[in-house]
A protein has these predicted regions:
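Phosphate-handling substructures
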Residues: 108-174
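Acidic, low-complexity terminal tails and accessory targeting/binding regions
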Residues: 36, 121-131, 190-195, 211-339
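Glycine-centric low-complexity repeats
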Residues: 1-37
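Active-site-proximal alpha-helix that buttresses catalytic centers in soluble enzyme cores
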Residues: 38-115, 229-230
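Sec-exported extracytoplasmic/periplasmic mature domains
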Residues: 78-85, 102-109, 177-184, 211-214, ...
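Active-site metal-coordination segments of metallo-dependent hydrolases
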Residues: 59-68, 94, 152-162, 166, ...
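Generic beta-sheet signal
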Residues: 40, 195-201
Length: 339
């Protein structure tokens, strides 16, 4: 998905940002835990014929790169290689991501690992239809809702394998967990001093997956600044402590504003019952009473924990904001998104 675009940047300052993006700044990664922090550079594939024609193109294995896409792949490989070495290289089942990953893999003598969780969000019956169309709008509705804290919303594309945001996010976070584990198994330190891996994926999966999981989401960027071909979205953190958005196509992302932090608190509160309800629903089809009982029990525990944590999280964020330098920067808004 997404039109043709030029190579994006891979630089950015570590920090938290959100609905309001300020200048980048150092910030603590995640909200707790002693897990080792890593950096993941999510890189969108190069141009495909579908991109050039502005078509919805998500099916596996899909087409390869255009001549321009091959040039973009080599250009981003050269840029990334200069910032290496890397702990790992990953791509999806889509030919276009594999062809985009190949130049970097060849330069560094590494073998990319294929992760289905990096596949593009599946468009079902809307495959090969124009992006600018009713089908294109319907394709967007579900994933946008997922980033706003409603993963239970179904994908409004009949036939999609990503039936809702819960299914999509579990596949995506599973891929991220694999990247994390593999990175720690080969803890090569990049030029900037961080353990870093590169994951080649697709525009919507990168955007929606990161916005659903980072502690500084900015969902509007999905619409105002779609990731271009070979553009990069950089995150830092770990599965235990959480993930922070570092940069979006070269735009540094600064610390979270108070509204963003409170949004994340609400997101954590309202997603817990959605996941619990979906797990209970799935357990009903197993025909196993024990599975249903376990799903109900686990769901109750998760919802209870979210309810207990919510007021503490809100209080912490308000207290932090009282003396936080970015509190005075709340008026920073949409005009500053794109320099």
């Amino acid at each position: 998905l997404g039109g043709a675009g030029g190579a994006g940047g891979v630089d950015g300052a570590i920090g938290r940002g959100g609905w309001f993006i300020g200048t980048g700044g150092m910030a603590t990664i995640g909200g707790g835990g002693n897990g080792q922090s890593i950096v993941i550079d999510f890189v969108r594939h190069g141009q495909t014929p579908g991109n050039a024609a502005m078509l919805i193109d998500t099916a596996v294995p899909g087409p390869g790169l255009t001549a321009l896409g091959q040039q973009q792949a080599q250009a981003i490989a050269n840029a990334l290689a200069a910032k290496g070495p890397y702990a790992g290289i990953f791509d999806s089942q889509l030919i276009r991501t594999q062809q985009t990953a190949a130049p970097l893999a060849n330069l560094l003598g590494m073998a990319p690992q294929v992760l289905p969780g990096l596949n593009e969000i599946h468009a079902g019956i809307f495959e090969d239809l124009p992006q600018i169309s009713p089908a294109g709008l319907l394709y967007l509705v579900g994933p946008i809702a997922w980033t706003l804290g409603f993963p239970i919303v179904p994908m409004l594309a009949p036939g999609s394998t990503d039936v809702n945001g819960i299914v999509f996010n579990r596949a995506f976070t599973g891929a991220v967990q694999t990247i994390y584990d593999a990175s720690l198994a080969n803890p090569v330190v990049a030029a900037d001093g961080n353990i870093t891996s590169v994951a080649y994926s697709s525009a919507f999966t990168i955007g929606v997956g990161t916005m659903m999981n980072v502690d500084n989401p900015h969902p509007l960027l999905l619409l105002t600044h779609p990731v271009p071909n070979t553009g990069a979205v950089v995150v830092q953190g770990n599965p235990e402590g959480g993930w922070t958005l570092v940069s979006w196509d070269g735009i540094p992302v600064g610390p979270a504003s108070l509204p963003t932090a409170l949004f994340v608190d609400v997101r954590e509160l309202i997603t817990a019952p959605q996941y619990a309800a979906y797990d209970i629903w799935e357990s009903l089809f197993t025909g196993d009473p024990a599975a249903v009982i376990n799903a109900v029990r686990d769901g109750a525990d998760e919802v209870g924990a979210a309810v207990v944590q919510f007021p503490h999280a809100v209080a912490d964020d308000v207290i932090d904001a009282t003396g936080h330098p970015y509190l005075s920067g709340l008026p920073i808004g949409l005009p500053s998104l794109i320099p």
